[in-house]
């Protein structure tokens, strides 16, 4: 079974965790922005709005 040879330093560990957390924060912000856009009806690229559905029928 593969095991690490040496203990990872705290600074290296903290850098990696900071990177992961930053990436997660960026993705969360994108998700919130997309959700707000959909809820306010400003998005035209995800779901068709109710007005467009009425025109098609």
Curated annotation (Swiss-Prot):
Cytoplasm keyword on record: no
Q: A single GO CC term, please?
A: large ribosomal subunit
Q: Which domain of life is it from?
A: Bacteria
Instruction: Give a yes or no for keyword Ribosomal protein in this entry.
Output: yes
Annotated GO MF terms: structural constituent of ribosome
Give the signal peptide, or none: none
Biological process, per Gene Ontology:
translation
- UniProt-listed InterPro entries: Ribosomal_bL32 (IPR002677), Ribosomal_bL32_plant/cyanobact (IPR044958), Ribosomal_zn-bd (IPR011332)
Q: Where is this region: Disordered?
A: 1-23
| Entry keyword set | Ribonucleoprotein, Ribosomal protein
Q: Pfam families under this entry? A: Ribosomal_L32p
Which pairs are disulfide-linked? none
Q: Which family is this sequence assigned to?
A: Belongs to the bacterial ribosomal protein bL32 family.
Query: What name does UniProt use for this protein?
Result: Large ribosomal subunit protein bL32
Q: Which organism is it from?
A: Trichormus variabilis (strain ATCC 29413 / PCC 7937)
């Amino acid at each position: 079974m593969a095991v690490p040879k040496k203990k990872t330093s705290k600074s290296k560990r903290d850098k990696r965790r900071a990177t992961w957390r930053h990436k997660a924060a960026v993705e969360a912000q994108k998700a919130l922005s997309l959700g707000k856009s959909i809820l306010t009806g400003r998005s035209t690229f995800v779901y068709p709005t109710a007005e467009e559905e009425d025109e098609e029928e």
